[in-house]
C-alpha cells in the first residue's frame, strides 16, 4: 500500500522530519553513507561530515544509510550515531525501496501502519507496513570503494532518473580499476609504474616470474579497492605469497607494481554545469610527507606520523 505523507500521524522523530520534508520548498538532497564495502567505516565519518556541512538554509538533507549487508534505510536519528556506527540501533531506520517509475525521482519509505492516522487505513491494511513516496532532487553518494566509487550506485540512480553529485558512471568505474586507469594514462603518454595483473587461480611460479621481472621491493594491491586496503609493500620474494593472499581478500584481480621512490601529490578537479567542454575548477596541489613506509589506511585517516602540505612545497 502506498500512502501520501499527509496520511502520517506526525508525532515527532521521523514523522516530524517527514512533515518538514513535505512542506519544504528547498531542494531535497539524499546523502548516502555506509555501504556494502570494506570501506564502510570510512564512509560513516565522511557521510556524517557532509550532512553536518550542508547549508540547511538552501537544501534539505535526507540521510540514507546503507548497512554492511547492503540494506537501505532512511535514517532520522542523530548524526553522532552515524560516526559511532550506532545508527542502526537507534530505532530510527526505515527501509527504503525503489520505484521503477523515473518520474517519481525518489524512494519508497516503509513506515509501520501504526504510525498512520486510523481514518486513512481500512481494517485489512493495519497489519502491514505502508510505503510512503519521497522524491529527491539529487543524490550525494558519500560512499567509498566497492558499490560506491566504482560506478554501480551511479548507474542505479541514472536508471532512476535522479542526478548524482560527483563523478559519473564511466569515470567512476575506470578510476576505481587500477589496471584500466594505467592503460588509459599510458595511452595518453603519461608515465605509469611497470605492473602485472593477475586473477585468482594464477600459479605461484607465474607470480614469482612476474615479480622477478619487476624487481624488489614492489607493491601488491587489489585492482578495485580504496583506502589502501589490501596493499602490501613486498621487500623480497619470501613476502610475496602473503601479500598476494591479502590482496585477493578485497578483489578477484590484483596488480603487482614496481616501487617508485618519490613523493605523493594530489589535486582535485571539478567540472561545471555537467558540460564536458566547460570550465574546470582546479584545486590547490597538496603534498603528502611520510616519515616511513607508504600512505596506508592508518596514516590516511589518523596522520599519526604523516603530514599534508597545502600547497605542496
Predicted regions and their residues:
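Short hydrophobic transmembrane-like helices used for membrane targeting/insertion
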Residues: 1-2, 8
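ATP-binding N-terminal substructure of ATP-dependent carboxylate-amine bond-forming enzymes
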Residues: 8-165, 169-170, 174-180, 187, ...
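Hydrophobic beta-strand scaffold residues
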Residues: 61, 163-164, 192, 218, ...
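Basic phosphate/pyrophosphate-binding loop/patch that engages nucleotide-derived ligands
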Residues: 184-191, 246
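ATP-grasp fold ATP-binding core
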Residues: 185, 211-231, 252-261
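Phosphate-binding site of ATP-dependent enzymes
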Residues: 235-313
Amino acid at each position: 500500500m502506498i500512502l501520501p505523507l499527509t496520511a502520517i500521524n506526525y508525532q515527532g522523530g521521523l514523522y516530524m522530519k517527514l512533515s518538514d520534508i513535505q512542506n519544504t520548498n528547498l531542494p531535497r538532497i539524499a546523502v548516502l553513507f555506509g555501504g556494502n564495502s570494506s570501506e564502510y567505516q570510512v564512509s560513516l565519518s565522511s557521510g556524517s561530515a557532509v550532512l553536518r556541512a550542508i547549508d540547511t538554509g538552501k537544501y534539505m538533507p535526507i540521510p540514507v544509510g546503507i548497512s554492511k549487508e547492503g540494506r537501505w534505510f532512511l535514517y532520522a536519528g542523530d548524526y553522532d550515531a552515524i560516526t559511532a556506527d550506532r545508527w542502526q540501533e537507534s530505532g530510527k531506520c526505515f527501509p527504503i525501496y525503489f520505484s521503477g517509475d523515473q518520474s517519481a525521482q525518489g524512494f519508497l519509505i516503509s513506515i509501520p501502519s501504526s504510525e498512520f492516522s486510523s481514518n486513512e487505513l481500512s481494517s485489512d491494511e493495519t497489519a502491514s507496513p505502508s510505503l510512503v513516496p519521497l522524491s529527491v532532487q539529487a543524490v550525494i553518494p558519500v560512499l567509498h570503494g566497492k558499490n560506491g566509487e566504482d560506478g554501480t550506485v551511479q548507474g542505479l540512480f541514472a536508471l532512476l532518473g535522479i542526478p548524482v553529485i560527483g563523478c559519473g558512471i564511466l569515470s567512476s568505474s575506470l578510476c576505481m580499476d587500477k589496471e584500466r586507469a594505467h592503460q588509459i594514462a599510458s595511452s595518453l603518454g603519461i608515465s605509469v609504474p611497470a605492473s602485472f595483473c593477475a586473477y585468482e587461480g594464477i600459479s605461484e611460479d607465474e607470480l614469482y616470474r612476474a615479480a622477478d621481472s619487476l624487481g624488489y621491493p614492489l607493491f601488491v594491491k587489489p585492482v578495485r579497492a580504496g583506502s589502501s586496503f589490501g596493499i602490501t609493500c613486498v621487500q623480497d620474494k619470501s613476502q610475496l605469497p602473503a601479500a598476494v593472499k591479502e590482496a585477493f581478500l578485497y578483489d578477484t584481480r590484483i596488480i603487482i607494481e614496481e616501487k617508485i621512490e618519490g613523493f605523493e601529490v594530489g589535486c582535485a578537479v571539478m567540472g561545471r554545469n555537467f558540460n564536458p567542454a566547460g570550465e574546470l575548477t582546479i584545486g590547490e596541489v597538496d603534498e603528502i610527507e611520510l616519515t616511513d613506509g607508504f600512505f596506508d589506511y592508518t596514516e590516511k585517516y589518523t596522520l599519526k606520523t604523516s603530514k599534508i602540505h597545502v600547497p605542496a612545497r
